[in-house]
């Protein structure tokens, strides 16, 4: 092959690599799971403290957790989702509650 053809092929490779690098990050749902022991007020507190929901939305999500077994608190990139779930789980443990926050890839 000639030098011009190699140069074009090289530019196509770079373009393909750039397109692969420009993919949006994977997103994860942060899910609050129901248990039989954590007080409803504590769940509302968690939703307000870690997810910045107002009292009405936090109460609605708490009821979703209670009646449906779980609720999505938000959708974030992996690092943010992992941090939020870890913060919630540590906070619940600190206060002696078995509340569990998990992640699911979207």
UniProtKB/Swiss-Prot annotation:
Signal peptide bounds: none
Name the record gives this protein: ATP-dependent Clp protease adapter protein ClpS
Assembly information from the UniProt record: Binds to the N-terminal domain of the chaperone ClpA.
Biological-process GO terms, alphabetical: protein catabolic process; proteolysis
Region (Disordered): 1-22
Pfam families, alphabetized: ClpS
Compositionally biased region (Basic and acidic residues): 9-20
Family under the similarity heading: Belongs to the ClpS family.
Domain of life the protein comes from: Bacteria
Function, as annotated: Involved in the modulation of the specificity of the ClpAP-mediated ATP-dependent protein degradation.
